[in-house]
A protein has these predicted regions:
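Short, solvent-exposed helix-loop connector elements
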Residues: 205, 328, 335-343, 358-375, ...
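Short, basic/hydrophobic alpha-helical segments
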Residues: 77-82, 163-192
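An anionic, glycine-rich sequence signature occurring as long contiguous blocks
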Residues: 10, 119, 133-162, 166-169, ...
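Short, conserved catalytic/metal-binding motifs centered on acidic residues
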Residues: 48-49, 89-103, 130, 193-202, ...
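Active-site-proximal, Lys/Arg-enriched surface segment
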Residues: 65-149, 154, 159-160, 295-302
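Short, surface-exposed basic-aromatic patches at helix termini and helix-loop junctions that form
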Residues: 186, 206-216
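Electropositive nucleic-acid engagement tracts
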Residues: 20-26, 31-105, 112, 218, ...
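Basic, low-complexity segments
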Residues: 1-20
């Protein structure tokens, strides 16, 4: 990094450094972040120290692995800075997870499990991620390790890896995500919609948790997710022999999401411009009531979940012929294009995962402890937020220059926007600029 860029980084890190207290920690934090941003094939402690400060390896290792400082305070500052940069009603909060392939069995949380990035089972660690995003600019603000069952059942193994006592109980990925959302809400981060794939959307407790927090959401679901027509009614069944019924039952049977949209009207839409032109797919949407109420036996039909809250059921038919299904609690008056654009905004978190790994070494940490892994992940997120702040500043500077030519237009020439208007054009973002050499 140049002297000017190093100074710029140090200034940007000032609110983070203020929370670290001790001067040694305030010196190691910028050094670690600079190592992540700078050139080099490996972004673990030893090679970063060798490149930047050969005499500081022990201090840098101590800072990330065992130093006494509260990472929760820096996580809060990261959320505050991300909100300052892109928070608002047009911003989305994307829930996902990412896998870090590993060899051996001693690194915290490592186990054979499904790795979404690889599309198969692999020996890896899985981190639940929260990404704040607006237009084409994502900022990751949360990475929390998921502990598989074979770790939860081994207290000695967890103790050896330094897993905190309050993190040793079994928690599903959706439960971890809800806890992280609570942390983000406590930091007053502003966003309009929560997005998640079917790994989270199939969880009724996750959707109910979002509802309980008063959040707007759009989530993927499997094609067999059961729903009811929106006009379903609860009625008393006709009494037969035996005891009379004490509970209402739905007057219609639930259907799979796939079957519910079989006769729906599909429209081909473009939700945003890609590098090769408009991105298009066919979409259909109907209002339904989700079958996630209490289970009840209904005659010879067996157990069925009762109708729950009303929501949008959305189908996507891709050019390849593949179909995807979603549920969303957006208002009933929202149009199909807005639904499609909202759902498809989730893609940007995959870009963030890739950049944190390829550019900043998220998966390069060589330690085995809970604390070290989460601190390394936190430093990569802080480095990523810094780089995104530079991208945003560069893009906003260009936008201001373009606006000068339109300064003479009257206010009356500008159309008013409704609350749920079609998504505005994305700010044209320059590429992420690390100091790593390009392949």
């Amino acid at each position: 990094m140049t002297k000017r860029s190093t100074t710029d980084l140090t200034q940007w890190l000032a609110p983070f450094l203020a929370r670290l207290g001790h001067k040694a920690r305030r010196r190691m934090c910028p050094l670690y972040v600079e190592g992540l941003i700078g050139p080099g094939d490996r972004k673990s402690v030893e090679p970063m120290a060798a490149r930047l400060a050969p005499g500081d390896y022990d201090q840098l290792h101590h800072f990330i692995s065992s130093g006494v400082w509260d990472e929760r305070s820096l996580e809060e500052e990261l959320a505050i800075q991300a909100d300052r940069l892109i928070g608002g009603a047009k911003t989305v909060l994307v829930i996902d997870d990412t896998a870090l392939p590993k060899k051996g069995s001693h690194s915290v949380g490592v186990a054979p499990q499904y790795a979404s990035a690889l599309g198969k089972n692999a020996n890896c660690q899985t981190l639940v991620s929260l990404t704040l995003a607006r237009d084409e600019l994502p900022i990751m603000i949360g990475l929390r390790l998921f502990l598989p069952e074979n770790w939860i059942g081994d207290a000695d193994r967890m103790a050896k890896a330094g897993v905190p006592e309050d993190c040793r109980a079994a928690r599903t990925k959706p439960e971890i995500a809800l806890a992280e959302i609570d942390r983000v809400l406590a930091a007053d981060v502003r966003f309009g919609v929560v997005l998640a794939d079917a790994g989270y959307g199939l969880s009724a407790p996750f959707r109910h948790g979002l509802d309980a927090r008063g959040l707007t959401w759009a989530v993927g679901i499997p094609r067999h997710q059961k729903v009811y027509p929106c006009d379903v009614r609860l009625v008393f069944p006709i009494a037969g022999r035996g005891r009379p019924r004490k509970r209402h039952i739905p007057d219609q049977l639930s259907l799979s999401a796939e079957d519910m949209l079989e006769t729906a009207k599909w429209r081909r839409l473009s939700w945003r411009k890609g590098t090769k032109g408009p991105l298009k797919a066919a979409f259909a949407a109907v209002r339904v009531r989700v079958a996630d109420g209490r289970p009840q036996r209904i005659g010879d039909k067996g157990q069925q979940h009762m109708p729950g809250e009303e929501a949008w059921l959305v189908g996507e038919r891709r050019n390849s012929g593949e179909r995807k299904y979603y549920l969303a609690n957006l208002p009933a008056e929202v149009d199909l294009k807005t639904l499609a654009a909202t759902i498809k905004a989730r893609w940007v978190c995959e870009q963030a995962h890739q950049q944190l790994k390829e550019e900043l070494g998220l998966d390069h940490f060589e330690g085995r402890s809970w604390r070290g892994l989460h601190r390394h992940a936190l430093m990569t997120m802080i480095a990523y937020a810094y780089l995104q702040s530079r991208r945003l500043a560069e893009a906003s500077g260009g936008k201001k220059n373009r606006r000068r030519t339109a300064a003479s237009k009257s206010a009356g020439d500008t159309p008013r926007r409704r609350r749920h208007s079609r998504p505005r054009a994305a700010l044209q973002m320059p590429p992420l600029q690390t100091h790593a050499p390009k392949a």
